[in-house]
């Protein structure tokens, strides 16, 4: 298993500076991670810096609350793709899910999938805020909407991925949709637990520490 190709090397803090973005880009190139995941304002710069590498550019949409309108999420997605994003991590409308407005949730995802024009879309369902049945339903809606991944967490809601949630998500979506675990994956042991549970992508700021077998102190 090529550990590095599981990792979206992530920096989503609002105070992220260009120097810090440069650091994660340099690290991603050195370790040949699958992608760097950055806020939309950094996408164009990251795409330019990574043009001569295999490392993809991932960004986030409707992040971290998922509470922006569907039209806004679609516009954000189109803008990100124009600026060079290869992959899109969107946040669902969590309140709509809890209301039982499942058509709204699915249509929200579908709009982003359409706007992404064939680029990979990962759907963040924020598992820490959901019960068992809501995790199942959100995963089902992700699959029905045609997204590529269902993803556990933003890392901004006070909790991250658990192996139990990853397994539940994978059992729900089956072989057609992949699972991304994010939030709280700080070391190789955490990484292995998520992969064993069914994750094929790991979102973490601790990519270097994971590769080196060390421990990180970040929540994402």
UniProtKB/Swiss-Prot annotation:
It is an enzyme of class 4 (lyase). Its main location: cytoplasm. Pathway: Carbohydrate degradation; 2-deoxy-D-ribose 1-phosphate degradation; D-glyceraldehyde 3-phosphate and acetaldehyde from 2-deoxy-alpha-D-ribose 1-phosphate: step 2/2. One of its GO terms (biological process) is deoxyribonucleotide catabolic process. SUPFAM superfamilies: Aldolase. Catalyzes a reversible aldol reaction between acetaldehyde and D-glyceraldehyde 3-phosphate to generate 2-deoxy-D-ribose 5-phosphate. This is Deoxyribose-phosphate aldolase 1. It comes from Staphylococcus aureus (strain bovine RF122 / ET3-1).
